[in-house]
Design a protein with these regions (language model features):
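Protein kinase catalytic-loop region centered on the HRD/HxD motif
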Residues: 116-128
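Activation segment signature within eukaryotic-like protein kinase domains
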Residues: 110-111
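Conserved N-lobe ATP-binding subsite of Hanks-type protein kinase domains
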Residues: 25
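C-terminal lobe helix-coil module of Hanks-type protein kinase domains
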Residues: 172-257
């Protein structure tokens, strides 16, 4: 493990650890020559890492604002280091832990952005299967943009493969086929997106893969359309899930549009109610003033009609 102040490749100063996972450790580093910051991933070579450059080889040909670039790769001793764009922000996991469950509109916006990124991966030829969609791999930038990080277990889709050669997944978000019983495909990522939506909706990860499928695990206030989307995403059988991320994205946009319309209507209703209450208040104030003036006039008339008796002293 590297320490703060260590120098890599004669120009990168280690500032701190950004994250640590099964495939390596990511450090925030500063280029001591140019002064800019980078995220550098350290992967230790061992017998498990058959293709230590698999992640770099997948990312190098990609060009999407929601995917970090790899700008350099170098070796130190027995380790490989990948220099990537540094994303200033926080993970979705950190955001939810700090703020709790999210509103429908924000859930849909994050999911929509994620669908755009994952859809881009699936549209590559051959398709790239991300396989590790989870809150800690989703970055929310300071500009409210979504960035997908850590392609450590991503793979190129192979038509001729029957099952995954290596079981690689994150418990709670991985599809059934990732546990060695089948082959990862585009629907594998759709499953992960469904679990991610459930996480944002509940404010906590699912305890089991079955949990989001059961109606009893949803509170009455939860959006019905979003429940339908989640349940379709996380079906056990691949054939029962959405056929593509594009189809899922379309449903999310429908929910977002409907939610915005409801918010707009609610806003108009509140504005109307506020206006009516203001009008009623004005009328009541007017009636009060009339009543007060009438009362005051009555008092004055009484005074005018009252005989004033002045006592006279008799000497």
């Amino acid at each position: 493990m590297l320490n703060s102040g260590d120098i890599l490749d004669e120009k990168y100063e280690v500032i701190k650890i950004l994250g640590k996972g099964g495939m390596g450790t990511v450090y925030l580093c500063k280029n001591i020559i140019l002064g800019n910051f980078w995220a550098i991933k350290e992967v230790i070579r061992n017998t498990k890492n058959i293709d230590i450059l698999a992640e770099a080889n997948i990312i190098k040909g990609l060009n999407h604002p929601g995917i970090r670039r790899i700008v350099n790769v170098f070796y130190v001793n027995n380790n490989v280091y990948m220099v990537q764009d540094y994303v200033d922000g926080q993970t979705l996991k950190e955001f939810v832990e700090a703020n709790g469950r999210m509103q429908i509109e924000k859930i849909c916006r994050i999911t929509s952005d994620l669908c755009d990124i994952v859809g881009y991966l699936h549209n590559q030829n051959p398709a790239i299967i991300y396989r590790d969609i989870k809150p800690s791999n989703i970055m929310i930038t300071t500009g409210e943009k979504i960035v997908l990080i850590d392609f450590g277990i991503s793979k190129i889709y192979k038509n001729d493969a029957v099952v995954d050669t290596v079981c690689a997944c994150s418990n709670g978000y991985a599809a059934p086929e990732q546990y060695g019983a089948g082959k990862s495909c585009t629907q594998t990522d759709i499953y992960g997106i469904g679990m991610l939506i459930y996480f944002m909706l509940k404010g906590r990860p699912p305890f089991t893969g079955i949990e989001p499928l059961l109606e009893e695990n949803y509170e009455t206030y939860i959006n019905e359309n979003l429940k339908i989307v989640i349940k379709k995403c996380v079906k056990i059988d691949i054939k029962d899930r959405y056929t593509s991320v594009k189809a899922l994205h379309k449903e999310i946009l429908k929910i977002l549009k409907k939610d915005k319309s409801q918010i707009s209507v609610q806003g108009k209703v509140k504005k109307t109610v506020k206006g009516v209450l203001g009008f009623i208040g004005a009328i009541l104030a007017y009636i009060y003033i009339l009543h007060w003036n009438k009362k005051e006039s009555t008092v004055m008339n009484t005074i005018d009609r009252t005989e004033i008796v002045v006592p006279i002293e008799v000497h």
